[in-house]
């Protein structure tokens, strides 16, 4: 590796990781409530320890969620069905401490009644719904992968997803739900990925498994297929370091081995460290919370900019004040990669094309639907196994037209 080259790493985790278990429980509850009442206001957190889960937070909804049943259903779907794997969905403890949303918060994002919705114009409605909290959010896109995601996090997610696939299908026997992946990519001085350096997989397994057998099986059924799919002939990967369970056996996993908590994998959820993060987590929050909806919107904006060929990579920063509809600020950073336009022109086009008020985001991306459980593992962005509305590139022509009109 030359002095100008850099090594960049990113990690992912499987759905059986204790923090991801908590994310999925929180989003399963959110989806259940949104399916009954699309205007539900939800902020639900989950914590996990050995054999017990605490579900807590605030909810205002016309719907009802049987939280205990939803927790157990989620755990069964992940694969925690026996004390042998460290957790039995049917016998674990579930403690629920959910209250109503604060009236002081609710007044800033109060739900519009049917009468108000009918009488008010869309513009009035957009002005009426302020942000659910203050905060700063970021969105990012880069043209180094077809999904416009950074290669390290995209590859790490694909490995984690495949690891779960072979576990659930039985293609690789003796695997258990908990697992992590990490990849390291070498970049040249033009910031282009030029070589795969390292692949790391740590996976929970049955006691009878040997480490040599596991390394061979994971290379054959997980690593090689994913590398061929993602890297192909574009990025050399014929001489990389493979690490499988480098500490040795990994029999005890999940919440039996480590406590879990909603919102503790925010870099895994987003861009693997390639972009800034405002600090707000996603799971368990309805779209009135800009931590979630604005992060999705900024990804949508960034992806359309790159898809339009205006820049090779872009980061969008947005900030809000609680109870105020219009963003406090919107910043566009192209890292000097803009193509035939200035950064100022791109920023002006963004302001013209995208309405980033919370209610407008919710409408444009159709966010008041039960679509969130699938986001809670393997990343919220750049997915190929499921379609999310913030991944659409439907504003490309409008952005080009806005640039041309300046």
Swiss-Prot record:
L-methionine binds at residues 58, 101, 258, 289. It is found in: Cytoplasm. Residues 101-111 are annotated as: Flexible loop. CDD domains: S-AdoMet_synt. Its cofactor is Mg(2+); K(+). K(+) binds at residue 45. GO terms for cellular component: cytoplasm. InterPro entries: ADOMET_SYNTHASE_CS, S-AdoMet_synt_C, S-AdoMet_synt_central, S-AdoMet_synt_N, S-AdoMet_synthetase, S-AdoMet_synthetase_sfam. Binds 2 divalent ions per subunit. It catalyses: L-methionine + ATP + H2O = S-adenosyl-L-methionine + phosphate + diphosphate. ATP binds at residues 17, 178-180, 258, 264-265, 281, 285. Its main location: cytoplasm. One of its GO terms (molecular function) is magnesium ion binding. Its EC number is 2.5.1.6. Mg(2+) binds at residue 19. PANTHER family: S-ADENOSYLMETHIONINE SYNTHETASE. NCBIfam families: metK. Belongs to the AdoMet synthase family. Homotetramer; dimer of dimers. This is S-adenosylmethionine synthase. It comes from Bifidobacterium longum (strain DJO10A).
């Amino acid at each position: 590796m030359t002095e100008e080259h850099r090594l960049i790493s990113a990690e992912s985790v499987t759905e059986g990781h204790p923090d991801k278990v908590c994310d999925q429980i929180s989003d399963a509850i959110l989806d259940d409530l949104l399916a009954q009442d699309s205007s539900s206001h939800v902020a639900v957190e989950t914590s996990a320890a050995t054999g017990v889960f605490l579900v807590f937070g605030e909810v205002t909804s016309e719907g009802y969620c049987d939280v205990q049943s939803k927790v157990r259903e989620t755990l069964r779907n992940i694969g925690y069905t026996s004390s042998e794997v460290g957790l039995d969905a049917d016998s674990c403890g579930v403690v629920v401490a959910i209250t109503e949303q604060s009236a002081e918060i609710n007044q800033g994002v109060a739900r519009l009644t049917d009468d108000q919705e009918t009488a008010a114009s869309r513009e009035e409605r957009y002005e009426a719904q302020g942000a659910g909290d203050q905060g700063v959010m970021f969105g990012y896109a880069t043209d180094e992968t077809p999904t416009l995601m950074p290669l390290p996090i995209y590859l790490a997610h694909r490995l984690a997803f495949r690891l779960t696939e072979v576990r659930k299908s039985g293609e690789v026997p003796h695997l258990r739900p908990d697992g992590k992946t990490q990849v390291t990519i070498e970049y040249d001085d033009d910031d282009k990925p030029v070589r795969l350096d390292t692949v790391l997989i740590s996976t929970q397994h049955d006691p009878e498994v040997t480490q040599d057998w596991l390394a061979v099986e994971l290379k054959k059924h997980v690593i090689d297929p994913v590398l061929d799919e993602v890297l192909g002939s574009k990025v050399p990967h014929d001489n990389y370091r493979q690490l499988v369970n480098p500490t040795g056996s990994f029999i005890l996993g999940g919440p039996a081995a480590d406590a879990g908590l909603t919102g503790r994998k925010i870099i895994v959820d987003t861009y693997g460290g390639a972009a800034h993060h405002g600090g707000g987590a996603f799971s368990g929050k309805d779209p009135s919370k800009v931590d979630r909806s604005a992060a999705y919107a900024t990804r949508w904006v960034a992806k359309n900019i790159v898809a339009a060929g205006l820049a090779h990579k872009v980061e969008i920063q947005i900030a809000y004040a609680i109870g105020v509809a219009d963003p406090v600020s919107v910043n566009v950073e192209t890292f000097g990669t803009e193509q035939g336009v200035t950064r100022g022109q791109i920023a002006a086009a963004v302001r013209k094309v995208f309405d980033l008020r919370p209610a407008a985001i919710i409408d444009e991306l159709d966010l008041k639907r039960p679509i969130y459980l699938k986001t809670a593992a393997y990343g919220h962005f750049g997915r190929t196994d499921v379609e999310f509305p913030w991944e659409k590139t439907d504003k490309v022509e409008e952005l080009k037209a806005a640039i041309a009109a300046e």
